[in-house]
Design a protein with these regions (language model features):
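N-terminal Rossmann-like NAD(P)+-binding domain of SDR-like oxidoreductases, especially those catalyzing
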Residues: 1-184
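Glycine/proline-rich active-site loop of Rossmann-fold NAD(P)-dependent oxidoreductases
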Residues: 159, 184-197
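Alpha-helical substrate-binding/gating segment
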Residues: 170, 196-200
Length: 200
């Protein structure tokens, strides 16, 4: 049975929810998060306080772009699966701070993919976004729809990481699954999301 799973973005809403589920079911989880202040960091610390209550949880706070720390952390943990959920989120913010997105989302994800290949993990799961569908007018969206017309820097970085992942899967036969999330909601959710704002 697979026991060791590396989760990036473990202080984020989806990362926290996944890590908690895995820990509750007996897995060993190592979380990796830079604790970005894109929204209230107190919420991220509160989520992590719950995770730290599990003896099978360990954590590294750093940037995905810090290849040396990332390499050492993953190599020492020796995960069978990597779930890459960390990213600089926010479509509007990407217009104001595009370089942040290029660095975090593209360079950070490339580092994860390269390490997954180097360590020959059983599976790499990467979070993408519904924003890659861009100007696509087909409704409802389908996995096979064209994704060449992104409308924001955020979406473009997500599409770029999908392309890098596809190339590694093709060249090295690295098992990769990409998840295109739409609006995700629930307990401990992000305060900047529409549903959270509506309830307020």
């Amino acid at each position: 049975m697979i026991k060791k799973i590396f989760v990036t973005g473990s202080a984020g809403f989806i990362g926290f929810s996944l890590a908690k589920f895995l820990l509750d079911n007996g897995y060993h989880v190592h979380g990796y998060d830079c604790m970005s202040d894109y929204y209230d960091v107190r919420l991220k610390h509160a989520r992590h306080k719950i995770l730290k209550g599990h003896e099978n949880f360990s954590f590294t706070e750093d940037m995905l772009e810090n290849q040396e720390v990332l390499d050492k952390t993953i190599t020492n943990f020796k995960p069978e699966i990597i779930v890459h959920l960390a990213a600089q989120a926010g479509v509007r913010y990407s217009i104001e701070q595009p370089r942040v997105y290029l660095s975090s989302n593209i360079t950070g994800t490339f580092n994860i993919i390269e390490l997954a290949h180097k360590l020959k993990v059983n599976h790499l799961i990467i979070a993408s976004s519904s924003s890659v569908y861009g100007a696509n007018k087909n409704m409802p969206y389908h996995e096979t729809d064209k994704t060449q017309t992104q409308l924001s820097v955020y979406a473009a970085t997500k599409k770029a990481t999908e392309s890098i992942a596809h190339s590694y899967s093709n060249i090295w036969k690295l098992p990769i699954t990409i998840l295109r999330f739409f609006t995700v909601y629930g307990p401990w959710g992000r305060p900047d999301m529409a549903l959270f704002k509506f309830t307020k």
